[in-house]
Amino acid sequence: MSSVRFSSALARRSFAVASPPLSAPLSSSARRFLSSSSSTISSSSSSVSTRSPRSLTSASSLLSSRTASARWTGLSSLNLTQSRTMATEIPKIKVKNPVVELDGDEMTRIIWQEIREKLILPYLDVDLKYYDLGLEYRDQTDDQVTVEAAEAIKKYGVGVKCATITPDEARVEEFKLKKMWLSPNGTIRNILGGTVFREPIIIPAIPRLVPGWNKPIIIGRHAFGDQYRATDRVIPGPGKLELVYTPVNGEPETVKVYDFQGGGIAQTQYNTDESIRGFAHASFQMALLKGLPLYMSTKNTILKRYDGRFKDIFQEIYESTYQKDFEAKNLWYEHRLIDDMVAQMIKSEGGFVMALKNYDGDVQSDIVAQGFGSLGLMTSTLVTPTGEAFESEAAHGTVTRHYREHQKGRETSTNPIASIFAWTRGLIQRGKLDETPDVVTFAEELERACIEVVNDEGIMTKDLALACGRKEREAWVTTREYMAAVERRLKANLKSRL
């Protein structure tokens, strides 16, 4: 039985079992499974207790006994050595080196616990270095837990991250925070550097909002600088705005920016040649790995020096390092203006990598995710050019709206697929670095189980059912019901390989 990997080849892969009609209710086999499971599977709202972001979410005694200090430093790790999985005869797989686990907030925190306890720990003997990035604990540690987590990823090489809250004014008031802390993703990216790559999870049974997209579109987002490290301020009244650069061994150079006649706003931002070069190398390497052409897009016609620097560095590195490899694989690299590239992207069938600046990549990755069917079907990985650090997470947020429903005791149907893939992509990287193919195979089998439950059995969460045009209640299941189906499918797939 072959494993599933998500690349250009996956988009062309045909499944052996035909997908059910999109307008039909769940298949009879799916209904039988859910009916037989109803005595043990309840809605997520009744099965998982609401927890404060400050508390650990693991149901295991190991996690519940951790101290606050251990949550911060990650020194207290999971060392589970049971020889068999629950209710199965499948041997546990040893993960050679640790994986850094970054917990998160709200609905995704609850789902994260379920994934860890039901789909990861029963099958893997893994040392998890745990850091609680829940908003309240970040506030308690003055956000040092985020810095420590990033340093741990540097040390161990691989991290998996749950979605987290980036506070705004309303969140500061809600959580009574000391201050409006920065985005933990931004903090981690600025410490690790590298490039964020977002790739769709393609499920043939889920129709695309952009129907022509038959091949993956991978967004490479430069994970450093620009607006995300900008200094901005409100200008209170008339005055002169200037930009001053002072060389280490030279006289200050002053550039006039604007003469304000009244109030306004101003912003300065920056990037570095070193970071742009790393971005270029990571982008070219990803394109070669996936066997796809690469497009780099900027607005260099307007930002002639700023965006022009990106364009020039990419071209220089392509010609000096990667052109021969691209041509040997019949691939190409091209710079295109961002507005032209976005228009061409919508008209295309997919099948390429886009290298984008920080803000452009942030926006376009969500557009691509929704175009392929759902924000819940998009992976996000942070990759450094030399491969010394790798972090994977879901591309979506903490699903606050579902969490509010959960707090009221109502059932929720939150798509966990991207969060599951955050674990699997991290495990695949860990297995590759450690040269442990059984770890890679397990992660690929878990990904395959997620896809097959939707594609072959018609069991899906509400967002995917709506994408299929199915609004009736019987068309979708709760989060825990979906994950129970994935667990069943995973066990069957693993047993068939023994």
UniProtKB/Swiss-Prot annotation:
GO terms for cellular component: mitochondrion. Mn(2+) binds at D339, D362. It catalyses: D-threo-isocitrate + NADP(+) = 2-oxoglutarate + CO2 + NADPH. The keyword rRNA processing does not apply. Its EC number is 1.1.1.42. It holds the Pfam family Iso_dh. InterPro entries: IsoCit/isopropylmalate_DH_CS (IPR019818), Isocitrate_DH_NADP (IPR004790), IsoPropMal-DH-like_dom (IPR024084). NADP(+) binds at T164, I165, T166, R171, K347, G397, T398, V399, T400, R401, H402, N415. Keywords: Glyoxylate bypass, Magnesium, Manganese, Metal-binding, Mitochondrion, NADP, Oxidoreductase, Transit peptide, Tricarboxylic acid cycle. Substrate binds at T166, S183, P184, N185, G186, T187, I188, R189, R198, R221. It comes from the Eukaryota. It comes from Aspergillus niger. GO terms for molecular function: isocitrate dehydrogenase (NADP+) activity; magnesium ion binding; NAD binding. SUPFAM superfamilies: Isocitrate/Isopropylmalate dehydrogenase-like (SSF53659). This is Isocitrate dehydrogenase [NADP], mitochondrial. Binds 1 Mg(2+) or Mn(2+) ion per subunit. One of its GO terms (biological process) is tricarboxylic acid cycle. Its main location: mitochondrion. The record marks Y228, K299 as: Critical for catalysis. Gene3D superfamilies: Isopropylmalate Dehydrogenase. The lineage of its organism: Eukaryota, Fungi, Dikarya, Ascomycota, Pezizomycotina. Belongs to the isocitrate and isopropylmalate dehydrogenases family. Its cofactor is Mg(2+); Mn(2+). It is found in: Mitochondrion. The keyword Magnesium applies. It is an enzyme of class 1 (oxidoreductase).
